[in-house]
Amino acid sequence: MRVDNNPKIDTLINQLDLGDHISIFRQFFSRESSLYIEGDQELHYRYIKALDAIEFKAPPKVSDFTNIKFHLKKQGVLQFEQIFEIVKVVRYFRYFQNRELEGIIGEWMNKFLIEPKFLEVERYFTHEGKFDENLDETLFHLGSRVKEHKANINESLKRLTSSQKLSPYLIDSQVHLINDEECLLVRGGFNHVLKGAMVGRSSSGGFYVSPDVILKTKEQIRYINEEREAIFYSYAKEFSSKLCELLPFINFIDKEFTKFDNYQARVLFAKSRDLKLIKSKKDSKIVLEGFIHPALHNAKPTSVNFSKNILMITGVNAGGKTMLLKSILSAAFMAKYIIPMKLNEHKSHIGGFKQVLAIIDDPQNVKNDISTFAGRMQEFSKIFECRDARSEERR
């Protein structure tokens, strides 16, 4: 999955004071993704608007499938956590299928045909992603034995805390879990009445001790857990083998989920902040009505008509000229990436631009005798040079 790693885009976002807005927007994604949606923008916008017309729950956080698919291609064994990442995506698409939606969203969801072989894997995972040991008789009995042994350990420790010989050395009567070891917290000199291994020290100088009396029971638990792990691994091998055969299906849902994630993030972000979804048109005209830059608080809406070749902005110092320029460029940038913004979507019109370049920062340099005007002319010159160079390459 391609993610944004473009210093120029990051610089532009900072220049336009969109950093916080984009950061909040990214939080709505289920997994890390590019801001730009590859492909037919008109078609993407249709899906986004169709999704915007319905209420739905946000997808769960999902990991990237790159390593998962790589392991399956090499016929490797996936961990249960990796398998559950696939299960989460399938269950989320099933949630949409069960709603029996009409229109393009319903048609899209009907494309997800879940193989019976996948259901054989999915049924072993609970809603929280835990392996359901109740479905395996051996695992169920082993789990019951572990619970019994742990109960015996607790009983043994309780008897120790009630011991009159040990009582003078006990700092408290609780059972502490240190490094997965059940321990008692005792004072120095405990070795006269208690045999055990010291696991750690408390901040008050006490000793965390795991008594020898529970050592045999803990060893039995370790043996049982090793047996359980062997069974878990056999299941992981079996599941991975089945998923390997379903790799085309996994590739498909991975690609479609990335697309859906881009759509839902925009829709839910817009709904959460009462923002509008607007995409760039196929011309170069910019008409903003009721636009508010996301970095401004309690701001008055901006309206501007930039339908001619040149727009002249004048005003006194600290009169908002730079912020107006940032607003125009921000609107163009957000429309290009279909990022929700605050404006009157019915009266606004934002053209499409291959690139958005901002010459905003004050380039004045006293040492090199460069004024603000001269510095900005240099920036314009660099842009024109790049454009001319690309024109020469096309020839």
Features from the language model and the residues they span:
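Conserved amphipathic alpha-helical "coupling/scaffold" segments
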Residues: 1-134, 138, 249, 253-267, ...
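Helical mechanochemical/support elements of P-loop NTPase systems and associated helical scaffolds
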Residues: 39, 43-46, 61-64, 79-85, ...
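Short hinge/gating elements
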Residues: 50, 135-139, 202-204, 236-245, ...
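A conserved P-loop NTPase coupling/switch region
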Residues: 56-134, 144, 161-241
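Residue-level signature of catalytic and energy-coupling elements of molecular machines
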Residues: 65-68, 210, 260, 288, ...
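Long, charged, glycine-rich C-terminal linkers/tails
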Residues: 163-178, 267-290, 346
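Charged, surface-exposed helical/loop "interaction arms" that form contiguous linear patches used
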Residues: 230-275
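ATPase nucleotide-binding head domains, primarily ABC-like/P-loop NTPase cores
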Residues: 273, 281-395
